[in-house]
Amino acid sequence: VNVFFLISGYFTINFKLNKFLMLLGEVIFYSFFIYIIFAIEGGEILNVKNIMKYSILAVNEYWFMTVYLVLMLVAPYLNIVIDLLKADKRKYSIFIITLFAITCIYGFAFDKDVINVNGGYSLIYAIFLYFTGNFIKTYDIINDCKKMHILYMLAGGVNFLLALFLVYLGKGNMAWKLFSYNNPIVYIQAIALFISFLTIKCNGRIGIFIGRFGQYTLGIYLIHSHSLLIPYRFRELEIIMKDMGVIFWPFLILLYCIILY
């Protein structure tokens, strides 16, 4: 999710009504199609309330799509701010650092309902990532940062060890919080992963492969994140994880994500 918002900022969003409506239509299609299947199978009641919920109001089923569609609407104004800032790297840097302090320091450590960063599941955090992505492109950060894949693995390792330590102390909720989108370590990981992919030359078959599979990513997200499917999505994984040690959880989750995709 973090990387997707970074990509949006890197290339910037040029709002077009037809693209907005096409994206909204895709959300409605997947949501309503899944609902109809459940209704036919008897797992959901077919009535006006549910038809409205899974069609016209379908966007509420997906926090990410809600945030992204709103981000598309406000993007023209964000781009104006970018035009004002990018002429002065110092001011833009201070702006990014300020947003980082608000969303990833205060928002991660203390925020409840004050600024509603909500663990990164929010518009304000998406906007911060949008600016970050643009900052990377504006000042060509790619050429200044080498071997970012190493930073990505180091940050991931540190976060994982911290989580294990908290689980050992019986602080399971705190351990889970470490995987919030606005955890400073996760934020750094996202940037490192994003820049790593930017430095890869995707020519020939690799480029074709990524292009073909990339176009299905949104559809896959809309399917496995649907509220009617979520109870079934993790059921088998939870059963397996109960019988496995905590140290194997990341590998199980990675394998499960690959299978799910």
Q: Language model features by range: what are they?
A:
Residues 5-16, 70-74, 78-81, 128-137, ...:
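Transmembrane alpha-helical segments
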Residues 124, 142-219, 225-253:
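Alpha-helical transmembrane segments and terminal signal-anchor/GPI-anchor hydrophobic tails
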Residues 95-141:
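Loop-centered beta-sheet repeat module
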